[in-house]
Amino acid sequence: AELTSCFPVDHECDGGASNCNCCGDDVYCA
């Protein structure tokens, strides 16, 4: 599932997670 809380999407910000959104210091991973 995609998280749309922040953009851009599809950043691998959480090692191994393929669908993450980064917003400042916050990372949202599906």
UniProtKB/Swiss-Prot annotation:
The keyword Metal-binding does not apply. Expressed by the venom gland. It comes from the Eukaryota. It comes from Phoneutria keyserlingi (Brazilian wandering spider). One of its GO terms (molecular function) is toxin activity. It is found in: Secreted. InterPro entries: Toxin_34. This is U5-ctenitoxin-Pk1b. Disulfide bonds join C6-C23, C13-C29. Keywords: Disulfide bond, Knottin, Neurotoxin, Secreted, Toxin. The presence of a 'disulfide through disulfide knot' structurally defines this protein as a knottin. Pfam families: Toxin_34. GO terms for cellular component: extracellular region. Belongs to the neurotoxin 04 (omega-agtx) family. 02 (Tx1) subfamily. Lethal neurotoxin. Causes spastic paralysis and death in mice in 4-6 minutes after intracerebroventricular injection at dose levels of 1.5 ug per mouse.
